[in-house]
Amino acid sequence: MSNVKDMSLAPSGHLKMEWAKRHMPVLCRIAEEFKNDKPFEGLTIGMALHLEAKTAILAETLLEGGAKIVITGCNPLSTQDDVAAACVEKGMEVYAWRGETNEEYYENLNKVLDSNPDIIIDDGADLIFLIHTERTELIGKIMGGCEETTTGIIRLKSMAEEGALKFPVVNVNDAYTKHLFDNRYGTGQSAMDGIIRTTNLLIAGKNVVVGGYGWCGRGVASRAAGHGANVIITEVNPIRALEAKMDGFTVLKMEEAAKIGDIFVTTTGCKDILRMEHFLLMKDGAVLSNAGHFDNEINKNDLKELSKSVKEARFNIEEYDLGNKKIYLLGEGRLVNLACADGHPCEVMDMSFANQALSAKFIKENKGKLENEVYEIPYEQDFKIALLKLHSMGADIDELSPEQRKYLSDWKEGT
């Protein structure tokens, strides 16, 4: 029995799904294969992902492959209630709504696990972590899992290194056709979309501080610069900081950037990127946002401690009054691109979710053959998805001739 906010919203959700599907040709191609082959016949797939239109197309693809789908959200503010209702009408079991309390969030994760799933598809590893801590009775049944995001992979690799991981997990995040496009172009566009549509402020001429220069950070920096911002990067890794500098951005310590920033975007996957000492240095009217998976990159407890009052300044914007200045927090410090917008563009999620679908199939086909480790995506899978995407965009590539292949594998031929 599903539990969603309002089933009458389903027609709107179906429209969103149809729009997304039109722009996800690779996943649709895989759905056709799954419809014919039924690789998941008789299996239950438990999913915890941002429940919006693109995710729904992934779930529908797995449903076409014969799976029973039981799904919840992976963030209290990222579920779109109309899409959740539409998924129920599609025949999925859904436990999710926007604005869940922390208790409700974990209740819904447990509802997914109550279905006794065979395969897990996760974003942030909350579902997998819950299995390992509170629902250990499920470990023997689960064939494996797939993890979508950097934050989740960090957690899972730590578990694997300590010998705590009890079933194999495929690292979807590090697929070339995921992180080079989803993390960079997806996060860049959708984070700026969330900031702009929520604040209705001009970006041009403002100092935009980006915390972190991984693929997500460089995507945000690129798009902010495209809007005319003065982009400032903060980093802890000198190699990435050097890249940012040579890409033309200012690189500062956060304590210096805090003094001059107008808009802040954290993209690190780590906690306390913005904290008390930074809030004290910020100017009146500073806007804070987070594009990392969890809401701990901006220390909200520190911000509350410094504030005389907190109120809603506008939908999805909280005003923290520190007495001598006001600081504005977007989307409760949760993922700004999903809490304040519609998430990544359909075209990049087409590749990310194609990887999820094929990785779930990989787990099924290799049941009992995999160790309890974090596995990288096979190169052949990356290659297939990239080629399908290229063709869908009207592009094509050359092939090496036999002579070229021989040359590249022969150490004898030189100048």
Curated annotation (Swiss-Prot):
Organism: Methanococcus maripaludis (strain DSM 14266 / JCM 13030 / NBRC 101832 / S2 / LL)
Compartments, record wording: Cytoplasm
Family: Belongs to the adenosylhomocysteinase family.
Keyword annotations of the record: Cytoplasm, Hydrolase, NAD, One-carbon metabolism
SUPFAM superfamilies named among the record's database cross-references: Formate/glycerate dehydrogenase catalytic domain-like, NAD(P)-binding Rossmann-fold domains
SMART domains reported in the protein's UniProt record: AdoHcyase, AdoHcyase_NAD
InterPro entries: Adenosylhomocyst_ase-like_sf, Adenosylhomocysteinase-like, Ado_hCys_hydrolase_NAD-bd, NAD(P)-bd_dom_sf, S-Ado-L-homoCys_hydrolase_CS
Residues bound to substrate: D123, E148, K178, D182
Function description: Catalyzes the hydrolysis of S-inosyl-L-homocysteine (SIH) to L-homocysteine (Hcy) and inosine. Likely functions in a S-adenosyl-L-methionine (SAM) recycling pathway from S-adenosyl-L-homocysteine (SAH) produced from SAM-dependent methylation reactions. Can also catalyze the reverse reaction in vitro, i.e. the synthesis of SIH from Hcy and inosine.
Pfam families (alphabetical): AdoHcyase (PF05221), AdoHcyase_NAD (PF00670)
Domain of life: Archaea
Hydrolase listed as a keyword: yes
EC number: 3.13.1.9
Note accompanying the cofactor annotation: Binds 1 NAD(+) per subunit.
One of the record's GO cellular component terms: cytosol
Catalysed conversion reaction: S-inosyl-L-homocysteine + H2O = L-homocysteine + inosine
Chloroplast in keyword set: no
Primary site of residence: cytoplasm
Enzyme class: hydrolase
UniProt GO molecular function: adenosylhomocysteinase activity; trialkylsulfonium hydrolase activity
Cofactor(s) of this protein: NAD(+)
Listed name of the protein: S-inosyl-L-homocysteine hydrolase
PROSITE patterns xref list: ADOHCYASE_1, ADOHCYASE_2
Gene Ontology BP, a term: S-adenosylmethionine biosynthetic process
Gene this chain is encoded by: ahcY
